[in-house]
Amino acid sequence: MKLRTLFFLLQLFMPMLALAQYKPVEQASTLTFNIKNLGFNVAGSFKGFDGTINFDDQNLAASNFNVTVDAATVNTDNNLRDGHLRDEFFEVKSYPRIRLASTKLGGKNGKYVFTGMLTMKSTTKPISFPFTADLVNDAYVFKGEFKIKRKDFGVGGTSTVSDELEVNLNVTAKKL
């Protein structure tokens, strides 16, 4: 009976074991954002990518993303503003990472839909957005964009900064 149970468990988990695992490449990946402040566009970025991506375009049901960025790396090319964002908006000493984790992936032929959870500070919210995945040599290049409302995540209070911002992801992940 134990052998039958073991065989069943192996069959159940074998697709997950066969998935190719990828890790974000810091130097080739970007997370950028655009937001309005006093009516002017402000562009910024984050670095410090970490996490794992298990991806097989033929087995999306078993594929998943669990990626973080370092909140303290926020950069808008203005040191004074960046310090304010780290301390007052992102509270990086208490909340050092921003996490994006999938719960479901859909699509085909290089065009997909990410459904999952975005965590900033102590708030986790559902998120869904289209993305592309292109295999280049032994690495995938994942690109997607979405809009969020910063106040939904408790980021910053009332200020002259717009609530809505656009986020662009361009993540290169190498096969482990």
Predicted features by range, described:
Residues 7-16:
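Bacterial N-terminal signal peptides
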Residues 1-5:
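Positively charged n-region of N-terminal signal peptides that target proteins for export
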Residues 20-176:
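Low-complexity, acidic/polar, glycine-enriched regions of mature
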